[in-house]
Amino acid sequence: MKGGKRVQPARPNRINKEIRATEVRLTGVDGEQIGIVSLNEALEKAEEAGVDLVEISPNAEPPVCRIMDYGKFLYEKSKSTKEQKKKQKVIQVKEIKFRPGTDDGDYQVKLRNLIRFLEDGDKAKITLRFRGREMAHQQIGMEVLNRVKKDLTEDSDLAVVESFPTRIEGRQMIMVLAPKKRQ
């Protein structure tokens, strides 16, 4: 829609004249309790301090209001939410494909990659694919998966097995490893 009115997003807290209560429980600029006062008195005190009267808890009886700089309050709030988002780690599932005949050199390279994924905190999905006549030798595939499991869970204590295949699904077996939680 072109040329439409831009709607201001609703504020989460009421400030100054938007507060509807007749009496409020007032908190000062530094967080000290002032007590229960009339709305007009609270607005005067906020005006004297040169800042806003912000309704913190509207559902309380009487509503809790604080004398503070609302712009600074919003800035601090957005800053803290950004910090929390930064700290969150998105866990990805990385996949490595093996074959029953994977040679020792290739196995070591793939194992190094698995170790790197787990150290970075990502889950690892190991897919073992069977082609053609390899389907007749499923026990070789299980040996490869057991070797990976042994190298990563028992020997290096890096991972926890989330799912281990009991049978073949289609032409492949899938094992999922999760990184061990660090203390």
Curated annotation (Swiss-Prot):
PROSITE patterns, alphabetized: IF3
Please name the GO terms that the record assigns under molecular function: ribosome binding; translation initiation factor activity
Keywords attached to this entry? Cytoplasm, Initiation factor, Protein biosynthesis
Which compartments does it reside in? Answer: Cytoplasm
GO terms for biological process, alphabetical: ribosome disassembly
What quaternary arrangement does the UniProt entry report?
Answer: Monomer.
Coiled coil location? none
Q: What is its main location?
A: cytoplasm
The record's similarity note reads: Belongs to the IF-3 family.
Physiological role: IF-3 binds to the 30S ribosomal subunit and shifts the equilibrium between 70S ribosomes and their 50S and 30S subunits in favor of the free subunits, thus enhancing the availability of 30S subunits on which protein synthesis initiation begins.
What is the designated name of this protein? Translation initiation factor IF-3
Q: Name one GO cellular component term.
A: cytosol
Superkingdom assignment: Bacteria
Pfam families, sorted: IF3_C (PF00707), IF3_N (PF05198)
> InterPro entries attached here?
T_IF-3_C_sf (IPR036788), T_IF-3_N_sf (IPR036787), Translation_initiation_fac3_CS (IPR019813), Translation_initiation_fac_3 (IPR001288), Translation_initiation_fac_3_C (IPR019815), Translation_initiation_fac_3_N (IPR019814)
